[in-house]
From Swiss-Prot:
Phylogenetic placement of the source organism: Bacteria, Bacillati, Cyanobacteriota, Cyanophyceae, Oscillatoriophycideae
Protein name: Peptide chain release factor 3
Function: Increases the formation of ribosomal termination complexes and stimulates activities of RF-1 and RF-2. It binds guanine nucleotides and has strong preference for UGA stop codons. It may interact directly with the ribosome. The stimulation of RF-1 and RF-2 is significantly reduced by GTP and GDP, but not by GMP.
Species assigned in the record: Trichodesmium erythraeum (strain IMS101)
Positions of transmembrane segments: none
Domain tr-type G: from-to ranges: 14-283
Nucleotide-binding recorded as keyword: yes
Compartments it resides in: Cytoplasm
Record-level GO cellular component terms: cytosol
GO terms for MF: GTP binding; GTPase activity; translation release factor activity, codon nonspecific; translation release factor activity, codon specific
Binding site for GTP: 23-30, 91-95, 145-148
GO biological process, one term: regulation of translational termination
Keywords: Cytoplasm, GTP-binding, Nucleotide-binding, Protein biosynthesis
Length: 542
């Protein structure tokens, strides 16, 4: 590798940061996302999630159903520049039914931001997603939100993180007051107090007063009890708290903690500044040939998301690619690891929710959008030079199953197109009866809302009204050994065998007990709760 190419790649890597935000529903994730964009200069005014008509819709919530309901139901990518760095912000669905989409997004992230509601602390969805971050050893930054509302004591919230998640905590800033008396935060990095003023609905960047802790005017700016409480808290943190350890942050053992209020912009810019300093740059990825450095000269990347109809006018399909190594260039020809085919990557795009702009090149850590003519599947690797294939992204085990019926035969073409495209992007898993005569697709979802989203999008994007018929199953297991082993076992009690989109056998059980009973009676059956990663095989279409 030439010194010039290595230097170009290293410079690009040093300037890049990316992260995904994880949280429980209603912790304020979309609001925080908007405010980070506001401070990053990517938008001029933030839009409330549950917007009045006069207000803007949140930038990241671009799908029609998201704007109607005020919830995020698909991951979006938001890219902006801040302080000479390029930040890729991967906004994820907060609703628990879409945890699979979040899981796929975390595969493309180098860092995670864990968002907590100060009144609620750790919540079930946050814990679940934390486990995924822990498994991937992602650095985790914690933002404790809604400090301008009544909430739990900061020390109690830190203790909960340490005891329940096993993380060391380091508060980078510390709140001054809570609820109506929340005045701002103390920045421990620079030993400065930031006193904030509310902006109208938090739509503009907050104006704040910055003073040193020893400044005589502090006692005039703060109520006496808040001032003495702050000094007492800081002494306690210095005496009993952990010291900041960048290595432990990068290995996911320590979480830097920030306090603030995304709605009123308190503490958002301080978080962004510290994130740039502490976050992990794009790093190595595990592959079939071992660990690959981002400065490896040949381009490689993987597909972590597919999205149909980002621009409903053009009925397009976009593949979201995480660039892992080398330099991506427009119109380059690459190899597709799963099929062995060569693909020309034309019309690459920089993404910003549903908005896109053409790009000429991209570097490790970047997320780019490529037109998908039906070639790509989630988890696919594309590469130049020597074959490299990254670890695939497994499917979650669904818990809700239903036939999707098309009551209007004249709409079959649109119905088929919608089902195939929504399957490709992972909006829902699609299964089929093992009986070839029954061709109605079976929707396999993590939660009820996923089924509603499929029906809404079939109507809104494909013009097809559908009917859902629920099935009495709650557990799915993939069968090792394929159909041959199932035929040897014969009929199973209270169980139905279906095939997934790749033609592999999946057993559906009415409940967990039913599943355990079959495993106990048939030890020769090896059952998995995640789908095996496929290679060199095309999925079945309707």
């Amino acid at each position: 590798m030439s010194i010039e190419i290595e230097a170009e790649l290293q410079t690009a890597v040093d300037k890049r940061r990316n992260f995904a935000i994880i949280s429980h529903p209603d912790a304020g994730k979309t609001t925080l996302t908007e405010k980070l964009l506001l401070y990053g200069g990517a938008i001029q005014e933030a839009g409330a999630v549950k917007a009045k008509r006069a207000q803007r819709h949140a930038t990241s919530d671009w799908m029609a159903m998201e704007q109607q309901r005020g919830i995020s139901i698909t991951s979006t990518v938001l890219q902006f520049d801040y302080q000479n760095c390029q930040i890729n912000l991967l906004d994820t669905p907060g609703h628990q039914d879409f945890s699979e989409d979040t899981y796929r997004t975390l595969a493309a992230a180098d860092n995670a931001v864990m968002l907590e509601d100060s009144a609620k602390g750790l919540e079930p969805q946050t814990r679940k997603l934390f486990e995924v971050c822990k498994m991937r050893k992602l650095p985790i930054f914690t933002f404790i939100n809604k400090m301008d509302r009544p909430g739990r004591e900061p020390l109690e919230l830190l203790d909960e993180i340490e005891q329940e998640l096993g993380l060391k905590t380091y508060p980078v800033n510390w709140p001054i007051g809570m609820g109506d008396r929340f005045k701002g935060v103390f920045d421990r990095r620079k030993e400065q107090i930031h006193l904030f003023e509310r902006s109208i609905h938090g739509r503009k960047a907050a104006v704040n007063t910055v003073v040193n802790l020893g400044d005589p005017q502090i006692e005039k700016l703060l109520d006496q009890d808040l001032y003495y409480q702050l000094k007492e808290d800081l002494e306690l943190l210095d005496e009993l708290g952990s010291a900041l350890d960048l290595e432990q942050i990068h290995t996911g053992e320590m979480t830097p903690v920030f306090f603030g209020s995304a709605m009123t912009n308190f503490g958002v810019q301080l978080f962004l500044d510290a994130f740039l300093e502490y976050a992990l740059k794009p790093g190595i990825h595990k592959s079939t040939v071992g660990e690959v450095s981002p400065t490896y000269p040949n381009f490689t990347g993987f597909v972590f998301k597919l999205q149909a109809n980002m621009d409903p006018k053009h009925r397009d399909r976009v593949a979201f690619i995480r660039v892992c190594t080398g330099k991506f260039e427009k119109d380059m020809t690459v190899s597709h690891a799963r099929t062995g085919k060569t693909v020309r990557l034309s019309r690459p795009q920089k993404l910003f929710a549903q908005d896109r702009a053409s790009i000429e090149n991209a570097y490790p850590g970047d997320i780019i959008g490529l037109n998908n003519p039906g070639v790509f599947a989630i988890g696919d690797t594309i590469y130049n030079g020597k074959k490299i294939e990254y670890e695939g992204i497994p499917c979650f085990s669904p818990e809700i199953f239903a036939y999707l019926r098309n009551p209007n035969p004249s709409k079959f073409k649109q119905f088929r197109k919608g089902v195939n495209e929504l399957r490709e992007e992972g909006a829902v898993q699609i299964m089929y009866s093992a009986d070839e005569a029954k061709r109605d697709p079976i929707l396999a979802a993590v939660g009820q809302l996923q089924l509603e989203v499929v029906q809404f999008r079939m109507q809104n994007e494909y013009g097809v009204e559908t009917r859902v018929e629920m099935l009495p199953f709650t557990v799915a297991r993939w069968v090792d050994g394929g159909w041959e082993i199932l035929q040897k076992v014969g009929r199973l009690f209270n169980t139905v065998a279906v095939k997934d989109s790749w033609g592999r056998p999946v057993l559906l059980f009415k409940n967990q007990w039913n599943c355990q009973q079959v495993e106990s009676e048939h030890p020769e059956l090896k059952l998995n709760n995640t789908a095996p990663v496929v290679s060199g095989q095309e999925p079945e279409s309707l």
